[in-house]
C-alpha cells in the first residue's frame, strides 16, 4: 500500500511539474546579452502622450521622403478613386431617390458644404483620408445655421495636446464625462491667447485607437518612422561617400628615402615641386621623381541594396500594401505573386473604405438629412424612408486578368453562387446606373440597325 501511494504521489507531482512548465516565454527570461534590449520593450508609454511627436515626425516624412509621399498619392487614388464615395438611395420611389441624390450632389459643391467656400466634399474626403493615416486622426466640425449645414476640417495640431485639467477631466485638449470615455468638449487653439471649446455633438472625431481609453489617434506611420528615417539616412550617407570617392581620385605619396618637410622652399621658386591635379584626354604630364601617385580603390557597397530592400518590405507590410506597390519595383513579380498581393491590398482598401463610410459619410449625411427635414424640404415620412434606405458606394477596381475573372464570375452567376448585383457591387457600379446605361445601349443599337437598314434598302433600290 505504501509503495502504491508513493507511486501515485510521484505521478501527481510529475503531472504538476508538467502543467507548471507547460508555457515558456523566452522574452521573460532573456540572457545577459539581450536583457537590456528586451527590458526596453517593457517600458510602458501612454499613446496619447506620444500623439504630438509622432504626428510631427509623420508629417515630416510625408514630404521629405519620396516613397512615403507616393504612398499618400496611392491611398487617394485606390481608396477614393475618381469620384469618391457616391450616394445611393434606394427607397423604391425613383422620384424621391433622384431628388435626394441630386440635392446631395448640389450640396457637395464648395459653395454649399464649406464655410469658407474653398473645398468641395471630395477635397474633404481626401484631406480626411490623408490626416487619418498621417496624423492618426481627423476632426470635422459641423458649422450650423438656420437653413444650412457646412463642414469645417480642423487641423489635428489645433486641438491643443498641451491643454490638461485633471479636475475637469480634460486631457490632451479633450474633455470627457466623469468616469467615462465619452467626449463632452474639444478645445481648439486659435492663437496663444485664444482657446475655444466646441461641443462634442458638433465634432466628428475619426481615429484609429490602440486601447479603448485613448483620446487621440496614433499615426499609421508610427511603426515605420524609425525604419524609414534609418533607410533614408543610410541612402544619403552612401551617396555622399560615393560623391567623395569619385571626386578624390588618389594622393601623392613621398617615395622612401626622400625626407623633406614641404614641397620646396616657398621663397625659392626653383625648389617648388609642381603637382598635377588635373587630367585631360590625350595628354600626358611628367611627374616629379620624388612623388608617387596612389589611387583610391573604387567604392562599391555590397549590402546597401539588400538592407534598403528588406527595410522597404517591412515598411510596406506595416502600411498594408505589397513591396512592389510601395516601391514600384516589378522586377521580381510574376502574375501569381502580383495577383495575390493585389487581392490582399484590396481587402485592406475595402476595410478603409467601409471605415470612412461608417465614421464620416453616414454621420454627415444623417446630419444633412436632419437639416432637410427641419427646413421642410422633406416630410417626416420621406425622412424615415430615406434614413433606412441609403448607402455610399465606394469605387471598384479593374480586373487583374479580365479573361479569367470575367469567366469565373459568369460561371458563379450561372451556378447560383453569385448574383449580377454582387458582381456589379464589387466593381463599384450602381445597379440603377447600370440599367440606365443598358437602356441607352439599346437605343444606340436600334439607331445603328435603322441606319444599316436604310443603307441596305438604298442599295437594293439601286440594283
Where are these regions (language model features)?
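Activation/maturation switch segments at domain boundaries
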Residues: 2-5, 288-294, 300-301, 338-351, ...
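N-terminal-proximal low-complexity accessory segments that begin disordered
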Residues: 1-87, 462
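C-terminal amphipathic alpha-helical
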Residues: 117-141, 300-400, 452, 456-463
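Structured, mid-chain assembly/scaffold modules that mediate subunit interfaces
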Residues: 66-215, 412
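Short amphipathic alpha-helical coiled-coil/interface segments
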Residues: 100, 104, 308, 312, ...
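Short, Φ-rich (hydrophobic/aromatic) sequence segments
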Residues: 54-88, 124-132, 221-241, 356, ...
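Extended, charged amphipathic alpha-helical segments
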Residues: 206-337, 341, 381-383
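Short coil/turn segments at secondary-structure boundaries
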Residues: 91, 119-121, 142-145, 241-249, ...
Amino acid at each position: 500500500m505504501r509503495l502504491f501511494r508513493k507511486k501515485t504521489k510521484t505521478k501527481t507531482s510529475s503531472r504538476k511539474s508538467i502543467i507548471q512548465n507547460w508555457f515558456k516565454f523566452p522574452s521573460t527570461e532573456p540572457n545577459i546579452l539581450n536583457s537590456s534590449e528586451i527590458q526596453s520593450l517593457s517600458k510602458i508609454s501612454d499613446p496619447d502622450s506620444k500623439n504630438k511627436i509622432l504626428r510631427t515626425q509623420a508629417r515630416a516624412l510625408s514630404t521629405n521622403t519620396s516613397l512615403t509621399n507616393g504612398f499618400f498619392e496611392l491611398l487617394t487614388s485606390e481608396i477614393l478613386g475618381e469620384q469618391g464615395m457616391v450616394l445611393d438611395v434606394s427607397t423604391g420611389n425613383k422620384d424621391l431617390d433622384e431628388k435626394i441624390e441630386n440635392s446631395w450632389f448640389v450640396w457637395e459643391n464648395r459653395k454649399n458644404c464649406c464655410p469658407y467656400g474653398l473645398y468641395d466634399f471630395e477635397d474633404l474626403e481626401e484631406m480626411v483620408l490623408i490626416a487619418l493615416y498621417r496624423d492618426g486622426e481627423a476632426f470635422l466640425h459641423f458649422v450650423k445655421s438656420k437653413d444650412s449645414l457646412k463642414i469645417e476640417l480642423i487641423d489635428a495640431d489645433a486641438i491643443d495636446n498641451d491643454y490638461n485639467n485633471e479636475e475637469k477631466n480634460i486631457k490632451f485638449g479633450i474633455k470627457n464625462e466623469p468616469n467615462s470615455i465619452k467626449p463632452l468638449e474639444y478645445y481648439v487653439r486659435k492663437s496663444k491667447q485664444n482657446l475655444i471649446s466646441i461641443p462634442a455633438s458638433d465634432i466628428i472625431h475619426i481615429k484609429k485607437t490602440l486601447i479603448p481609453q485613448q483620446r487621440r489617434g496614433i499615426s499609421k506611420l508610427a511603426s515605420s518612422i524609425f525604419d524609414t528615417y534609418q533607410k533614408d539616412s543610410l541612402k544619403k550617407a552612401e551617396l555622399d561617400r560615393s560623391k567623395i570617392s569619385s571626386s578624390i581620385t588618389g594622393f601623392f605619396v613621398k617615395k622612401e628615402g626622400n625626407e623633406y618637410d614641404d614641397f620646396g622652399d616657398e621663397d625659392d621658386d626653383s625648389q617648388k615641386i609642381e603637382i598635377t591635379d588635373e587630367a585631360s584626354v590625350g595628354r600626358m604630364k611628367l611627374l616629379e621623381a620624388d612623388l608617387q601617385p596612389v589611387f583610391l580603390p573604387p567604392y562599391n557597397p555590397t549590402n546597401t541594396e539588400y538592407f534598403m530592400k528588406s527595410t522597404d518590405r517591412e515598411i510596406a507590410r506595416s502600411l498594408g500594401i505589397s513591396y512592389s506597390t510601395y516601391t514600384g519595383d516589378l522586377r521580381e513579380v510574376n502574375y501569381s505573386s502580383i495577383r495575390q498581393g493585389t487581392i490582399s491590398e484590396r481587402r485592406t482598401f475595402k476595410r478603409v473604405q467601409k471605415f470612412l463610410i461608417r465614421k464620416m459619410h453616414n454621420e454627415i449625411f444623417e446630419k444633412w438629412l436632419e437639416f432637410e427635414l427641419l427646413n421642410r424640404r422633406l416630410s417626416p415620412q420621406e425622412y424615415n424612408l430615406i434614413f433606412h434606405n441609403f448607402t455610399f458606394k465606394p469605387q471598384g477596381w479593374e480586373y487583374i486578368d479580365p479573361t479569367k475573372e470575367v469567366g469565373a464570375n459568369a460561371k458563379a452567376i450561372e451556378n447560383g453562387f453569385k448574383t449580377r448585383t454582387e458582381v456589379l457591387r464589387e466593381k463599384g457600379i450602381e445597379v440603377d446606373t447600370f440599367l440606365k446605361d443598358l437602356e441607352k445601349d439599346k437605343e444606340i443599337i436600334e439607331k445603328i440597325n435603322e441606319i444599316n437598314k436604310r443603307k441596305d434598302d438604298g442599295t437594293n433600290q439601286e440594283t
